[in-house]
């Protein structure tokens, strides 16, 4: 079966791209390894920021439901859930594995919206059961309705660490502390204030020293860090927890992009190795587009906009829409994107995207 | 430092602890004339992030529409009726309504509250300050649940007047949601 666009990853970026392309006449296949479309949105119970006209104030789970319903109602989109993309081949085909077996599908263009994976942290005892990534804790609680334990140490005060701490409390689980290695809280102040007034201490310049327990986590030792992020002996504190939740950042999931031979570059501000792509989200391999965390760690509002830009660019590339209409609509989306990124808290990602832009211009010039 | 807001740091505490400082809160305190006229919204929003639902939620034009989505909200307190729409709308749960005219001894505080079970009318609740310290008791005046089940409920609490700018969270006595912290 040949499709005009194959989207790998049914999260906010992939679904937004699939919809935008299909609405402009492109025949699309969406592949996702989960049974349900939506990516991380299916467990995000907090209300989104951004513009009211674009889902601000709406909870992630609801945004995911709206995207999923729209995709399933779109006749030009074929959805393959429970299906994993195993590899990309130079004849523009993709090896996929679904419950019914392994097969190949061919696409004129591709959108890799494969998301991110969580970063691990090194400390003694980090292999004990009870040490979780924040994504797993969120899945257990918000998708399956299972409490991960009774008492938690959260490591990392980015938005994920803060939001998951809040959700743990909503589920009736104690959060003993949130430790943050940096001198400042990483996430939004409103999220921090929200968990602080529930009585959860946020300890900056602190980290986990070690986890205790014979067969599973029975406690943890935290300590203060000096300016070089080394633990200060004598500042250790033992805390009574059975869960250690790591919210220590994400790194783009680029395996398929590497394998497809897309040029990659290391951009620390975007979380690690990312593909090099232009303002239309197209990589240096013509016809291969990227969006979402795979293109740089950010958040779902910007991921959805990048997905839309990619979907629109695919439609233009395939000749489905006239150039001037594409440019007009693309510029509106690009302006929204740069407005979302224009605040003081986005300075890091702005630096990252400037690096990519400079690389693209350098190669063209 | 003892202040109108209780025992809070004087400044520079927000980004290192999550606790707004006296300086932060002084910057968003409604003027005396607004506090004397009735219920009024207090926007405890101190950091420029891309977010605008409060401006959209206000039916009275008190919270100005955003020209840049990253702006901090600007409120015209004399137009604010204290209706509480913005409390439920704020994605950051950073808006409260305070009515210091409720009675000679008591004030009303409207707080976003996303915990179940929701308290019942007239139920006694425990009140906490911005650092999560227990600061007193209040009684539930009313609970506004919102249109759908995903909306943020707003709980209006009668509290001692001295807590009008101190209490910013509530819990049920012996609630499972609060045990341990």
Task: Give, region by region, the residue ranges found by the protein language model.
Chain A
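Residues forming the flavin
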Residues: 1-365
């Amino acid at each position: 079966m040949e499709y005009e666009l194959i989207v790998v990853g049914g999260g906010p970026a992939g679904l937004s791209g699939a919809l935008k392309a299909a609405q402009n006449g492109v025949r699309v296949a969406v592949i996702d390894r989960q049974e349900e479309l939506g990516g991380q949105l299916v467990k995000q119970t907090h209300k989104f920021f951004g513009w009211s006209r674009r889902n601000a104030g709406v909870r992630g789970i609801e945004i995911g439901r709206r995207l999923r319903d729209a995709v399933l109602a779109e006749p030009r989109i074929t959805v393959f859930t429970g299906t994993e993309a195993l590899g990309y081949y130079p004849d523009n085909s993709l090896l996929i594995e679904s419950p019914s077996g392994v097969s190949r599908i061919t696409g004129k263009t591709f959108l890799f919206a494969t998301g991110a994976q969580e970063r691990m942290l090194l400390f003694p005892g980090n292999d004990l059961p009870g040490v979780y990534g924040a994504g797993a804790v969120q899945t257990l609680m918000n998708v399956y309705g299972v409490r991960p334990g009774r008492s938690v140490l959260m490591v990392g005060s980015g938005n994920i660490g803060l939001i998951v701490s809040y959700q743990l409390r909503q589920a009736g689980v104690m959060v003993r502390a949130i430790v943050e290695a940096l001198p400042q809280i990483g996430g939004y102040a409103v999220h921090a204030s929200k968990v602080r007034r529930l009585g959860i201490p946020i300890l900056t310049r602190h980290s986990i020293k070690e986890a205790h327990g014979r067969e599973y986590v029975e406690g943890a030792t935290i300590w203060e860090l000096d300016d070089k992020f080394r633990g200060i002996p004598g500042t250790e504190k033992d805390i009574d927890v059975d869960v250690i939740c790591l919210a220590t950042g994400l790194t783009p999931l680029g395996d398929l992009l590497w394998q497809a031979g897309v040029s990659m570059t290391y951009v620390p501000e975007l979380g690690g190795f990312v593909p090099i792509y232009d303002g239309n989200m197209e990589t240096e391999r013509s016809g291969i587009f990227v969006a979402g965390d795979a293109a740089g760690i950010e958040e779902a509002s910007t991921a959805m906009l990048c997905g839309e830009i990619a979907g629109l660019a695919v439609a233009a590339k395939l000749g489905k829409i006239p150039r001037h209409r594409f440019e007009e609509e693309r510029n509106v989306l690009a302006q929204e994107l740069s407005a979302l990124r224009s605040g003081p808290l986005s300075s890091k990602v702005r630096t990252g995207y400037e690096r990519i832009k400079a690389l693209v211009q350098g190669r063209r010039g | 430092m003892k202040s109108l807001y209780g025992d809070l740091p004087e400044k520079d505490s927000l980004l290192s602890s999550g606790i707004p400082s006296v300086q932060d809160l002084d910057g968003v305190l409604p003027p005396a004339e607004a506090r004397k006229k009735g219920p009024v919204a207090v926007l405890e929003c101190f950091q420029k992030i891309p977010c605008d639902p409060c401006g959209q939620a206000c039916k009275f034009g008190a919270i100005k529409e955003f020209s840049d989505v990253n702006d901090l909200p600007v409120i015209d307190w004399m137009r604010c009726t204290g209706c509480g729409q913005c409390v439920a709308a704020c994605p950051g749960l950073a808006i409260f309504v305070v009515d210091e005219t409720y009675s000679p001894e008591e004030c009303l505080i409207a707080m976003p509250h996303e915990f179940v079970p929701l308290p019942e009318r007239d139920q006694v609740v425990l009140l906490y300050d911005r650092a999560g310290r227990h600061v007193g008791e209040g009684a539930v005046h009313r609970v506004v649940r919102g249109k759908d089940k995903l909306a943020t409920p707003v709980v209006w609490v009668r509290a001692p007047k001295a807590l009008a700018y101190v209490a910013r969270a509530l819990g049920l006595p012996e609630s499972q949601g609060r045990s341990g912290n």
